[in-house]
Amino acid sequence: MTQVCFVGDPEINLRYELLSRETARDALQTYDLGTPFHNSIGVETVSLGAAVALTNDLNWYIVRFVADVLVYDPSVSESEWLSRDLATAIRDDDVAHEESGRFLKIYGLEGDHGGTGGDGGSSPEADREIASEGEEVEESPITTGPSGGSEEGSAIDSGPRIGAEEPPRLVEPMYVTRTGPTVPEYDLRDVENTLVVRVTEDEFGA
């Protein structure tokens, strides 16, 4: 299974913005929604191609409400995430799996107590309430993504929990180049943990 995580802009409530809009809600309704990080929505899809297709279907909303899109595919790396652009390049065979790990963006994780996320206390009932109360807005037409879903016990929804605490917050990314087998140390601030995201060369140089 391939995981996709949409991280919201700091000034908005991402779950509300997406679930209060009919087209985005329809695109996400076949998935079990998790909250692996603060102000994020995480889903599991059947493949890397399905994950990229979902991000394309939600592009109108990504541009307006999302600060970052992260993709996790264990066939590429069991410990590192991919940027949306790199996931697309790998799907299109423009970048080989084994050549994808040179350019990195490392996030600090604040409030992480040993896991990489949890569900943040959300529930299907709360999501339905958001959907019913949300004001429908006029939006550009997009198609819904492929059918997907999470098996019971999936990593993104029933992995390490934070209990009553907030999911960890992604902070202050640091861009580094990997020149050996280890990842350079994150040194922008003191954090409990880090999240490594592989990016494209163009993203690294931007």
Residues of each region from the PLM?
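Acidic, proline/glycine-rich low-complexity IDRs
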Residues: 100-206
